[in-house]
């Protein structure tokens, strides 16, 4: 399956590795040129994962059209408060048959909507059809 991971931070990079390890073709999108260049050239993301090496099969791009081209699954791993702004820019590129998994936590400050509700509102999808993946670590 071709997967577009949108967000090249710690969570996006980690999920990209897990998805490649599961046998998927993965491309990661990010805004930071230095991070994208490092992922492509050195298979690392030192700003997020320190010395951890990423799979050689992982490619990265700053071009959202390239990232979404042919994607069967989109994994959202961008900052929560930038979700609406990004989706408004991208919505013409995201067809209704592409599955979406949101890893975003919290609520949109300006509307008090959950991230799945923002996705539903902007993309015109039933919020029950949006998968939400979260992970919280508890230290006792």
Spans of model-derived segments:
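Short, well-ordered coil/turn elements that cap or connect secondary structure elements
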Residues: 21-23, 53-55, 95, 124-127
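N-terminal Rossmann-like dinucleotide/flavin-binding domain of flavoprotein oxidoreductases
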Residues: 54-57, 66
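Conserved short-loop catalytic and cofactor-binding motifs
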Residues: 27, 55, 103, 107
């Amino acid at each position: 399956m071709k997967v577009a991971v949108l967000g090249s931070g710690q969570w996006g990079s980690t999920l990209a590795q897990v998805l490649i390890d599961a046998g998927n073709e993965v491309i990661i999108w990010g805004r930071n040129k230095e991070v994208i260049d490092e992922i492509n050239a050195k298979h690392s993301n030192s700003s997020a994962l320190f010395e951890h090496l990423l799979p050689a099969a992982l490619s990265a791009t700053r071009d959202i059209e390239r990232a979404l081209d042919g994607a069967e699954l989109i994994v959202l791993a961008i900052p929560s408060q930038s979700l609406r702004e990004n989706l408004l820019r991208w919505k013409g590129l995201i067809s209704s048959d592409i599955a979406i998994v949101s890893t975003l936590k919290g609520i949109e400050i300006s509307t008090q909507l959950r991230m799945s509700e923002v996705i539903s509102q902007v993309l015109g999808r039933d919020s029950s059809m949006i998968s939400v993946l979260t992970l919280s670590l508890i230290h006792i």
